[in-house]
Regions:
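Active-site proximal loops enriched in glycine and acidic residues that flank catalytic Cys/His/Asp
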Residues: 124-126, 158-160, 192
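Extended substrate/RNA-proximal surfaces in nucleic-acid metabolism proteins
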Residues: 7-124, 179-188, 195-206
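C-terminal active-site rim and adjoining tail of enzyme catalytic domains
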Residues: 127, 146, 153, 159
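Short acidic/histidine-rich active-site segments
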Residues: 154-168, 188
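Histidine/acidic-residue-rich catalytic or RNA/ligand-binding cores of hydrolases
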Residues: 9, 13-14, 105-113, 132-148, ...
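Short, conserved active-site loops that position catalytic residues or coordinate cofactors/metal ions
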Residues: 1-7
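His/Asp/Glu-enriched short active-site or ligand-binding loop at hydrolase and phosphoryl-transfer sites
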Residues: 121-134
């Protein structure tokens, strides 16, 4: 199983509304691979507001939300954390993208507790740790997330965050952290598609 998402249009991604409206035309099974199509939505502020209208959320198979610097109106560490928690409590949001990339200062322990409570997965993001991104806090932050996930026995999802076709399923920056944290395979939902589908929190009916 593979899920493909485009950043929603608020951040200037390719995902204008008509793009998401047309996703129903795409087969959900191609070349023996099950596809889930969705959006990486923008968390806009410390209230946890998400962009795109709810009508579009309902059209998607998978809904990821994350903080992006171009449209994020942040505050203190506590305020930022509460904004992400509010987004996690949104019944449509199933995954929080790259919480460890350093765009906003966050309390990872609080996020992990809410992840366990709400079944909103936290992503361990490969691309944010690429040398070309110059995000020096990304690796230590993601290591902390792995250690907390292990402590609280909370599953995570690995994301390649591929910005080009050759980057798809590239987890080369994640694996050294997995080894360092001695992170158990059973908490990585990428390895268990059936468990991933069962773990995702149910969203409101379309």
């Amino acid at each position: 199983a593979t899920f493909l998402t485009s950043v929603s249009s608020y951040e200037g991604g390719c995902g204008f509304e008509v793009y998401f409206r047309n996703l129903h035309c795409v087969p959900r099974q191609l070349y023996g691979i099950k596809l889930m199509l969705g959006a990486e939505l923008n968390i806009l502020n410390t209230k946890g507001d998400i962009d795109l209208d709810e009508d579009y959320w309902r059209m998607l198979d998978i809904r990821i939300a994350g903080i992006h610097s171009l449209c994020w109106q942040g505050g203190s560490k506590e305020e930022n954390t509460q904004g992400v928690i509010n987004a996690m409590r949104n019944p449509f949001v199933q995954i929080i993208s790259h919480p460890g990339d350093g765009t906003a200062e966050l309390d990872f322990e609080e996020l992990m507790k809410v992840s366990r409570e709400t079944h909103t997965l936290l992503e361990i993001n490969n691309h944010s740790m690429a040398p070309i991104r110059h995000k020096t806090v990304a690796a230590p932050n993601n290591l902390e997330l792995l250690e907390l996930a292990k402590k609280y026995e909370t599953p995570v999802i690995f994301g390649s965050d591929a910005h080009f076709s050759t980057m798809i399923a590239d987890y080369s920056n994640i694996m050294p952290l997995v080894e360092k944290a001695e992170f158990p395979d059973e908490l990585v939902l990428n390895y268990q598609p059936e468990k991933f589908m069962a773990y995702l929190k149910p969203t409101p009916e379309k």
